[in-house]
Every structure is written in C-alpha cells, then in structure tokens.
C-alpha cells in the first residue's frame, strides 16, 4: 500500500469511481455470482443498498448504484469468513492490535460465538445454547433498566419493531441508537419547529426547485447517488450553492458513471455555482447574517413601496415567533458574524441575494450542521430561513436532512426511541396485552454514562460498532469490559466485540443482500429512506453460512429465552414477516395497508403533515425558534485555539473503513493526517507533510490529556482556524460531556485543540 499525498484532479464519479468499484469487487467478491447481484440493488424486486438513505428514483437506471454502495455490497458478500478456525489462531488480545480496517476485512461472521476468558478466544456454540445463556443472564437482573438496547441504522423495520417490543416487554425504554450520534438534532429540532422530526421534500421536488443550498455535508462520499439529482437540476438551469469548511469535490463537479457521453468524452458537470468556506462552528452566525440582510432589505422594500422579499401572508397565517426572531437577528453585530463565520458581509450578502431571488428553495444539510453543542438550534435556524419565504409545504421547496444508514429513520419510526409517546405505548400495550414502561430511558450518551458509572450491567447491540462510534473511547473502554453481559448481533467483526464483558456473545446474521428463508418461504423486509418512502428489500444471494439467522429470528430467540411467560407469539411472527407488518400497522396507523402497499413497485410514502402545511405543534403553527447569540459551540468560545472537526474518508462508511484512501482529498494509503488551509499552516508555521501533535482543550482553554500525535499535515483548500481529522480515530478527543443538551448529540464537529510540532 503506497502512501502519498497527491491532489486529485478528476471530477467526482467518473473513471475514478469505476476503478474504485472494480478494485473492491476484485478483492472481496466472487465475480461469477455476486457481481450479478448488484443489478438487483435498489430495484423493486431486489434488495436495498445497505449504505446511505438516499431515495430510489421512480425510473431508475439498469445499474442504479454508486461507488460507495458498490463498496458496501462487496464488503457484505465477501467470500472471506471469520469462523472457529480464525479464532483458534487469533486471541482477543492479539486482535486488539489489528486496525479497524483489518478487523472487518477478515470476513463474514458465520456461526454463534461465546468468549472464553481462559483461552482469550471466541468459541462456537449452538444457537439454542446462546439464546438460553443470554436469556438466563437477562432474567438475573433485578432492574430491567440495567440493560442497554443499542440499535444500528442497518436494522430493518421488522427487526427494529420486534426489538423494541422485546425490550419494552422486558421493562426498559433504554434505546441508544446510532441516530443519537448523527441526526438527533433533526428529530428534536424539526419536531419543535414544524411538528415533524423528518425532512419535508420528495425526490420530485428536486425537479421543481430554483435553488438548492447544500450546507454541512459531502454528497460525493456520503450519499453519491444524490449527485445525479444535483446534476439534473443544474442541467435544467436551477442553481446549487455549497457552504462547507472544506472544498469537497462532490459539491464542485461530477461525471456521471451512468452517462456514456460524459464517460467517453471525460466531460463533467459543474455543480455549485458558488462555494463558501464557512469556518467550523460558524454556521449559525452565517445563517443569522443571511436572515438579518433579508429582514433589512424587506424593510427597505416596504418603505419604498416595493413588493416584499418575505412571504408575509405565509408568516402571518402559518407561523408564530417571527417578531422575536426579528429582534434577535437585527441585534447580531456584523463584526461578530464575520469573525465567527469567517465570511465577509459581502459574501453573506451574495448568499442572501441568491436566496431572495429564488421562488422555490431546498436546503440540504448533514452532520456539519447537527454535530455541535447547539446542533438542534442550528437545524432550527435553517427552518427559520425557509419559513421566512414560505419554503416549507410547497412543491420544489423544503428542508432535506441527509440521513446516514439506510434505515436509521425507519428504526425510529417503528419505536426505537428512549422517549416514546403515550399514544404509541397505549397502542403497543393494547395490541399485545401488557403494560409497557413509560419512564424515559437512555439515549447513546446517557447509555455510555450508565456503563461508565456501573449503573448498566448489560449491553445488547443490534449491529453497529458502539464503542468505536462514541466519544471518549479511553474513558469508556474499561467500563465496557466490566459489564456482566455483552451481546453483539453482527455480520462482521469489529472493535466493540473485542471489549469483552464477563459474558460476551457474537450472533451472526444475514446481510441485506442474502435470501431470508423462514417457515412460510423467502421473506422481504422494509426500510424507510431519508424522504419517508417505505419500500421492500428482498435478498437474492445464498447466505454466507448455513448457520446464519435473520435479525428478526435472533430477536425472537433472545426474547423467548429471556421472557418464558411472554405474551408475544415470537415464533409465529418470525414464520412470516407479513405478520410483523400487520402488528406494526395496528400500532402505527400511518402504516395502513402496509403489506399491500409494499408490494407496489417503489413502495409508499409516509404522510408528512408539515409538507402539507399542517403543523402538529402545540401552537398549531410552524414556530420561528430563536437561539440566543451566534455560537453553536459555547465550549469553543475562547479565542486562543483552533477548532477540529471529524469526518469520514472516501473509503469509509460510518465506522466501517473499506480502505485507506481518501481519493477526492488526495490522501492515499494512510489515515493519520490533519487537514488545514495554507493560511492556517503559515500561521502555525508548519509545512505540507510535516508531523504535528494535536492536544484537546478544556472549555476554559487549558490543555487536556487527550491528544493525537504525529499527524501528517495536508494543506487543503478550506476555511482558516479550522482543522479536520478522520472519524473514528479522533473520537477520543471529545468527552462525553461535550454534547447538545437538547438532543444529546456529541460535538464531533467542533473540538477545541492546540497544535504543536512533533519531535
């Protein structure tokens, strides 16, 4: 593996993407069988991509797959296996020295495993023995709230519904979820603003909009199929404007791999008509600057007798809180807005002008907006901006949060939440004949805090890499090994499995691409994409191992063992997933005719009240919500520091690292790097390729013990006073206390640091 730093000249997509897919296929897959399966991905009769949550177009290409989707499926259907012989040769202690890429690259898990402390190895056992032992441990706890039930966004609606049903019959609302670490500010912030914790747009709205503002996200790496929609809107004359600390190739230009002309001529489409490098932590200041200019210009237009820039009728009819917002933004000083955002008043005026001129605007955002101490307020400022011109609830306009995992939104819809509504619990109890717990449970941060204090005794993980994804890894590693029970439902080995509890189990499950055969035949599961479309997913490949079970079957097996007097007919439900969907429909009325509607190509759309201008808020209207001040990260407010954000590389999906390259940013064969602007490098007196140390700072600006040593400097076009490193290696630079008090999301995108040369 050759290490080099070399500027990448190509557009996003193109032959670079094709070559990357070919390499992934060559290294992981049986080309004769498995590559054919890619043609079934994101198709009505096929399986849903296990990667991102970008929706499927109604009329998709014959090969509707992106580079990172291809990597995800190649990673899943690899012919490499992690079995008993693998663990006979590798102790847990030795595996802890492996890199995270190496661990997952070892292959698919194919049989149930139990950790043996004497040999320091995982050893195989039967499914029934695993279920019985796990059930016995769960029965031994005096308080159901001593168990944490973690969920990954790869879990299907059916498995997630059974999982929450099991946990609630057991007696707990402890549901730490991967969404707590990515888009919880969306769920909390949008619900308070517009009454629905989800985006309001459909894919068709991108065909009708005049302007798309992309802020705080990187589609070229995190949701590449979005580039096709951006390309199409630019081709028809609409505009896209990018706001991001780094220049990301996927926001700049794109060569569509499915377009023969662009591929053969090596041509490309310019995406962003303008690109603004806001400083890390400067989004709120920028947004308030835009709103101030809009209000001032609207006032001037009114005084001169010209038409209003704002949608006064919409504001008066559909909203409350505008007067308070108006006072707040007009009191924001330009010197502070410019200092915090890193953009000039002139640049912000350009943005405001573009927004004012557009009749229909969509704002797309990702974790660059959410992963801050005031991430919830960030989301609400985006809503405020849209509400000012009536850009919610009309075609071609709205708010578009870009979710990560393919079903992270669906899991929440069917009950994976630590704060369930009274109505949901009443319907659940009525359907099954038991009284669910009503006390709020733990989200991710509270869950890890309970583990660290010894309050929690057991952790069950439905997928994911909980230990690696959380902040303050060094502080939490030892407490995780002091748990009484750890159960990991997984397809591949990861670091969380190696932090073994007194009783640790790995339970292997089918991948999204594999045939799920139950008593009544092959089963389909369902997922919900970022735009609230529900559709079926049917595996087409032979399972990687004969002992693999479905997630639904694993949940049912544990539940039957842990709850011998259960009121739920677990085995009956798993025989035919239509039965699970019938129960979901009974508990959640929005899923009416569930089984009938998922049999239609493309599935169905869950009604979004806000998109219809029905505001399910206490006020009965959409709320302008004011956030005091300009700082989205108060603990980073002092001036004697740099601010670091964590990001994925291009060869990565969440904690899964497919390879060591970050092609679009010009990094190859390595991950121990720190990105900074040429201006910042000059200020810090460092050069491209030099090694530096980063030391995390406390809220009062003092050096902490958390550090990253010998990172290679990569000079990159980006905002000053901003540094970028890779997630999850840099997660330990953040404490569990550094999170948004409203949503609980960790502040991964704004960590105060100090830089020093390495010796």
From Swiss-Prot:
Cofactor: [4Fe-4S] cluster; Mo-bis(molybdopterin guanine dinucleotide)
Coiled coil: none
Any one Gene Ontology molecular-function term assigned to this protein's record: 4 iron, 4 sulfur cluster binding
Cited InterPro entries: Asp_de-COase-like_dom_sf (IPR009010), MopB_CT_YdeP (IPR037951), Mopterin_OxRdtase (IPR006656), Mopterin_OxRdtse_a_bac (IPR010046), Prok_molybdopt-oxidoreductase (IPR050123), YdeP_MopB (IPR041953)
Binding site for [4Fe-4S] cluster: 49, 52
Cellular component aspect of the GO annotation: membrane
Keywords on record: 4Fe-4S, Iron, Iron-sulfur, Metal-binding, Molybdenum, Oxidoreductase
Presence of the UniProt keyword Coiled coil in the record: no
Regulation: induction: By EvgA.
Membrane-spanning ranges: none
UniProt cross-references to NCBIfam families, sorted A to Z: Fdhalpha-like, PRK09939.1
Known role: Probably involved in acid resistance.
Similarity comment text for this entry: Belongs to the prokaryotic molybdopterin-containing oxidoreductase family.
PANTHER family the record matches: PROTEIN YDEP, RESPIRATORY NITRATE REDUCTASE
Listed name of the protein: Protein YdeP
């Amino acid at each position: 593996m050759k290490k080099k730093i070399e500027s990448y000249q190509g557009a996003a997509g193109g032959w670079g993407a094709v070559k990357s897919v070919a390499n992934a296929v060559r290294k992981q897959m049986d080309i004769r069988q498995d590559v054919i399966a890619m043609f079934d991905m994101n198709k009505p009769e096929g399986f849903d991509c296990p990667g991102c949550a970008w929706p499927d177009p109604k009329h998709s290409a014959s090969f509707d797959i992106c580079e990172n989707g291809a990597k995800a499926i190649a990673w899943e259907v690899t012919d490499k296996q992690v079995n008993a012989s693998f663990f006979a040769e590798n102790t847990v202690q030795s595996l802890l020295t492996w890199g995270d890429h190496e661990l997952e690259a070892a292959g698919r898990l194919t049989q149930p495993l139990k950790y043996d402390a004497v040999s320091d190895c995982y050893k195989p056992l039967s499914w029934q023995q695993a279920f019985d032992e796990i059930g016995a441990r769960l029965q031994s706890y005096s308080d159901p709230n001593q168990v944490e039930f973690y969920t990954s966004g790869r879990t299907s609606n059916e498995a997630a519904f059974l999982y929450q049903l099991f946990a609630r019959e057991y007696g707990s609302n402890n549901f730490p979820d991967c969404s707590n670490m990515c888009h919880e500010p969306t769920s909390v912030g949008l619900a308070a603003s517009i009454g629905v914790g989800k985006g309001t747009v459909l894919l068709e709205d991108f065909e009708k909009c005049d302007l798309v503002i992309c802020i705080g996200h990187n589609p070229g790496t995190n949701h590449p199929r979005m580039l096709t929609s951006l390309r199409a809107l630019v081709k028809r004359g609409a505009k896209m404007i990018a706001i991001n600390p780094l220049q990301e190739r996927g926001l700049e230009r794109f060569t569509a791999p499915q377009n023969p002309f662009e591929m053969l001529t090596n041509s490309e489409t310019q995406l962003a008509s303008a690109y603004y490098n806001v400083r890390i932590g400067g989004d709120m200041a920028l947004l308030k600057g835009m709103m101030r200019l809009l209000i001032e210009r609207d006032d001037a237009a009114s005084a001169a007798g010209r038409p209003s820039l704002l949608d006064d009728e919409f504001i008066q009819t559909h909203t409350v809180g505008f007067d308070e917002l108006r006072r707040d933004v007009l009191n924001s000083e330009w010197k502070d807005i410019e200092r915090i955002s890193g953009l000039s008043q002139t640049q912000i005026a350009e943005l405001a002008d573009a927004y004012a001129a557009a009749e229909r605007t969509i704002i797309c955002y990702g974790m660059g907006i959410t992963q801050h101490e005031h991430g919830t307020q960030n989301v609400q400022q985006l809503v405020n901006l849209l509400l000012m011109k009536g850009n919610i609830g009309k075609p071609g306009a709205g708010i578009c949060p870009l979710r990560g995992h393919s079903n992270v939104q669906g899991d929440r819809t069917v009950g994976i939440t630590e704060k369930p509504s009274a109505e949901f619990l009443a319907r659940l109890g009525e359907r099954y004949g038991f009284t669910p717990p009503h006390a709020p449970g733990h989200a991710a941060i509270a869950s890890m805090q309970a583990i660290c204090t010894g309050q929690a005794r057991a952790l069950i993980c439905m997928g994911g890499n909980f230990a690696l994804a959380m902040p303050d890894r060094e502080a939490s590693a030892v407490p995780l090994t002091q748990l009484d029970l750890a159960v990991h439902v997984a397809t591949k080995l990861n670091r969380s499995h190696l932090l073994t509890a007194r009783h640790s189990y790995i339970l292997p499950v089918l991948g999204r691409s594999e045939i799920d055969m139950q008593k009544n035949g092959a089963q389909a599961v369902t997922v919900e994409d970022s735009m609230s479309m529900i559709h079926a997913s049917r595996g087409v490949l032979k399972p990687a191992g004969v002992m693999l079970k479905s997630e639904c079957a694993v949940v049912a097996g544990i539940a039957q063992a842990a709850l011998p007097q259960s009121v739920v007919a677990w085995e009956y439900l798993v025989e035919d997933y239509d039965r699970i969907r019938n129960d979901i429909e009974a508990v959640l009325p929005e899923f009416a005719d569930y089984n009938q509607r998922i049999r239609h190509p493309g599935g169905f759309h869950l009604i979004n009240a806000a998109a219809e201008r029905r505001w399910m808020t206490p006020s009965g209207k959409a709320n302008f919500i004011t956030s005091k001040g300009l700082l989205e990260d108060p603990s980073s407010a002092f001036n004697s520091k740099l601010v670091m954000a964590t990001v994925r590389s291009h060869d990565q999906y969440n904690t899964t690292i497919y390879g060591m390259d970050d092609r679009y940013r010009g990094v190859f064969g390595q991950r121990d790097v720190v990105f900074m602007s040429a201006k910042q490098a000059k200020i810090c007196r460092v050069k491209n390729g030099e090694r530096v140390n980063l030391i995390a700072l406390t809220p009062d600006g003092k050096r902490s013990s958390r550090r990253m040593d010998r990172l290679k400097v990569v000079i990159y076009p980006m905002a000053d006073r901003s540094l970028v490193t890779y997630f999850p290696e840099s997660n330990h630079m953040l404490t569990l206390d550094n999170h948004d008090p409203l949503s609980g999301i960790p502040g991964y995108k704004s960590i105060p640091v100090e830089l020093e040369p390495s010796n």
